[in-house]
Amino acid sequence: YNKSDLVNDDTRDQNSVENSIWVSAEHRQGIEELKELIGRLTVTDTMTRRLVGDLIQPGDMVVLVIPIDSAAPKGRLILPQQQVIRDVLETGAMAVVCRDTELEDTLRRLEGKVSLVVTDSQAFAKVMKLVPDDVYLTSFSILMARFKGQLDAAVKGAHVLDRLRGEGQRTAGDEAGKAPKILIAEGCTHHRQCDDIGTVKLPGWIREYTGLEPEFTFVSGTEFPEKLAGYDLVIHCGGCMLNEREMKSRQGRAEQQNIPMTNYGTAIAHMNGILDRSLRIFQTKVNI
């Protein structure tokens, strides 16, 4: 209640209920208490959910594969990489960071000691050949999808690529075939480079996998459309710069309109034939 300076103590006592507080803007009273109350009431399970900490044990060795190319930001790691490193450290495990070009040597030096390898999605094809089958392997993007509660939907969405691939095989050489429409969405508005994963690499991999020439639409930031009718598939980035509410809103929008939606890492893992392996750690450690 505001304007507490205008009411007496009896009025306050009669009108006070659970989780209520009296505030006076005039006298600056109760404002800090109000902020603390709002903070307590808005606690969500996101604050207790873990990116990777529930999948590893103290003392585990976790290798993080982070390619450094022209699309990587200068002088820093992107947010999911920072968050995974922090979560590994909070668990009491050890994070070893390397580029994909040094992964083979890193694994050789750590032979028999690595519990998990987390890779940037675009390096999946190379990394999968180097990581022993008895070592868990996943990606930052897949970890982010699980963290935001969207992994199940992302896995289902990735399998739409198989349907498109089948259509590509059936219509090979038939120019009358209708090109599928795919929306590729970025949560942030970074400056795109010549080898950008969302606008260059991912479309190229999809063309190669499906044998089709899909009609791609690219959006970023707040450009995500309200109406998704006409799209065969939505492929979203990991959404590290979007809060959980916004990501759920976008996922819900797709579900309400019966448009399958996946994310970069899940789609790339599926096209490389290692999606099942990328999910193995979740199926073994927790129920997704």
Spans of model-derived segments:
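P-loop NTP-binding site
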Residues: 56, 60-288
